[in-house]
Amino acid sequence: MKHVGPVEPAAGGPEVPPVAALGAAPESAAALFGPRLATAQRYAEVLGTAGVERGLLGPREVDRIWDRHILNSAAVAGLLGRGDRIIDIGSGAGLPGIPLAIARPDLEVVLLEPLLRRSEFLTEVVDELGLAVEVVRGRAEERPVRNRFGDRDAAVSRAVAALDKLTKWSMPLLRHDGRMLAIKGERAAEEVDRYRRVMTASGAADVRVVTCGANYLRPPATVVSARRAKPPHPKSARTGKAGTR
């Protein structure tokens, strides 16, 4: 098992709080992660130490790793079907993909991350936690990524980009009727109103804002859900039955 370690800290780099600052896992974590709670606890420790040292998480986030990051991510699990194949776009420190993989071992999870240092961190974390998760260095808009992962049941993301870009990246990675699940902030509804036309033009349907984890998160996770619509039937130039101009 490979240990997730720090990089050499630069002068004036972030001061890493002690692991004790994380505190014990909240009771809701035991309900979400069940027998894999120890794995979730270890992930929290990695985020609060190596994650801070390597610039993937701010030092001020350590005391709220559970509520703001891990539980906020895992709350989306209730929106996923059994055995769903999901791709985490712009995974960064592994949010939301790693908490979902811990909470739901039935899921097939791919972590997609374009930056080398982040993808290396993700590979180390996945190895240390013993997760059956694939880490891929790449961007959602790249053709090789779309060719390989263009049939996912769900594309998840968290604080990656505005909905216009995120929809354009997500839809080509989904099977028809697959869903984009984007964890957003409290202004998610405003963002949906702003970009609804662009989202529809990019193939999104049934766009709505849902909340998850309201019984244990304050505030609950706010998620923009959108289904990939089936494309219209292509016109047939050979038969001449394409319709009128």
UniProtKB/Swiss-Prot annotation:
Residues 223-245 are annotated as: Disordered. Keywords: Cytoplasm, Methyltransferase, rRNA processing, S-adenosyl-L-methionine, Transferase. Pfam families: GidB. One of its GO terms (cellular component) is cytosol. Its EC number is 2.1.1.-. S-adenosyl-L-methionine binds at residues 90, 95, 140-141, 158. Signal peptide: none annotated. InterPro entries: rRNA_ssu_MeTfrase_G, SAM-dependent_MTases_sf. Gene3D superfamilies: Vaccinia Virus protein VP39 (3.40.50.150). It is found in: Cytoplasm. Residues 227-245 have a biased composition (Basic residues). One of its GO terms (molecular function) is rRNA (guanine-N7-)-methyltransferase activity. SUPFAM superfamilies: S-adenosyl-L-methionine-dependent methyltransferases. It comes from the Bacteria. Belongs to the methyltransferase superfamily. RNA methyltransferase RsmG family. PANTHER family: S-ADENOSYL-L-METHIONINE-DEPENDENT METHYLTRANSFERASES SUPERFAMILY PROTEIN (PTHR31760:SF0). Specifically methylates the N7 position of guanine in position 518 of 16S rRNA. This is Ribosomal RNA small subunit methyltransferase G. It comes from Mycobacterium avium (strain 104). The gene is rsmG.
